[in-house]
Each structure stands twice: as structure tokens, then as C-alpha cells.
């Protein structure tokens, strides 16, 4: 079974590119990372930074998560991210996404030992 940390990496990490390569980025990535296999995941964010830099956020600014839990952390610096949002015309199994590139602070929930990101909460 996929661990929470591994799932975070599959769903949110793309260190191989510094930003979204094209407007088709989300359509390709959401499919290749298995987020359209049983339904279209409505919203997802990819982070274009090194895994080490994203894992380091777990020791940065402690903030409250959207759900009220206290194990969320906000990055000190902005990071290159790509937001993928399902379009109005998207219909499973032909999931369609709008690709939006941004530089924002990320907020992740961290758990475990080692203490690593397991959930992408928000970007600000």
C-alpha cells in the first residue's frame, strides 16, 4: 500500500521541471500521476522544487491547517507551483484541466518519523 509520504510525492512533487512546460501540462501530469484513474481529481497542485526543499517546510512556520489541525507548516520562501483545476467541460474518463503557474508560499501537513509532508493544504 502506498504510504502517505509516497502519495504526497506522487500527487504534488515535480522537481524535474522549474515550471509548467505548456498549457497541456496538467492534462498530461494528472493522468500520468494516476489522479484520473477512477475519477477526475478536481483540484491539484504540483511543486517544482527539490524534494529536500519541500520536506524542509516541515520545520518552518507552524500554522493551522484548513481543517483545524495544528500540524501544518508554511514555507518561509515562495516556491514555483502549478495549479491544476478541472474545467467545466471535463467529464470522466476524459478529464480536462486548466494549468496555472504561480510563485507562492506552500502550506503542507506533516506527519511521521522522519517528519515529512503527507498533505498539501494550501498556497498563499
Swiss-Prot record:
Class of this enzyme: lyase
Tissue: Pancreas.
GO molecular function: lyase activity; nucleic acid binding; ribonuclease A activity
Reactions the enzyme catalyzes: an [RNA] containing cytidine + H2O = an [RNA]-3'-cytidine-3'-phosphate + a 5'-hydroxy-ribonucleotide-3'-[RNA]; an [RNA] containing uridine + H2O = an [RNA]-3'-uridine-3'-phosphate + a 5'-hydroxy-ribonucleotide-3'-[RNA]
Keyword set, alphabetical order: Disulfide bond, Endonuclease, Glycoprotein, Hydrolase, Lyase, Nuclease, Secreted
Main localization (coarse): secreted
Parts forming coiled coils: none
Enzyme Commission code(s) on record: 4.6.1.18
Disulfide-linked positions: 26-84, 40-95, 58-110, 65-72
Modification note: Swamp breed ribonuclease do not bind carbohydrate, but there is evidence of a polymorphic form that does.
GO cellular component, one term: extracellular region
Active-site annotation: 12, 119
Subunit structure, interactors included: Monomer. Interacts with and forms tight 1:1 complexes with RNH1. Dimerization of two such complexes may occur. Interaction with RNH1 inhibits this protein.
Role played: Endonuclease that catalyzes the cleavage of RNA on the 3' side of pyrimidine nucleotides. Acts on single-stranded and double-stranded RNA.
Protein name (Swiss-Prot/TrEMBL): Ribonuclease pancreatic
Organism: Bubalus bubalis (Domestic water buffalo)
Amino acid at each position: 500500500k502506498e504510504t502517505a509520504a509516497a502519495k504526497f510525492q506522487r500527487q504534488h512533487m515535480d522537481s524535474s521541471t522549474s515550471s509548467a512546460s505548456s498549457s497541456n501540462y496538467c492534462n498530461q501530469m494528472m493522468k500520468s500521476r494516476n489522479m484520473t484513474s477512477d475519477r477526475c481529481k478536481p483540484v491539484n497542485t504540483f511543486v517544482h522544487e527539490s524534494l529536500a526543499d519541500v520536506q524542509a517546510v516541515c520545520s518552518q512556520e507552524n500554522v493551522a491547517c484548513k481543517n483545524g489541525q495544528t500540524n501544518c507548516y508554511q514555507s518561509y520562501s515562495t516556491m514555483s507551483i502549478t495549479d491544476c483545476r478541472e474545467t467545466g467541460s471535463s467529464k470522466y474518463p476524459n478529464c480536462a484541466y486548466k494549468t496555472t503557474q504561480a510563485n507562492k508560499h506552500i502550506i503542507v501537513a506533516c506527519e511521521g518519523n522522519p517528519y515529512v509532508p503527507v498533505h498539501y493544504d494550501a498556497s498563499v
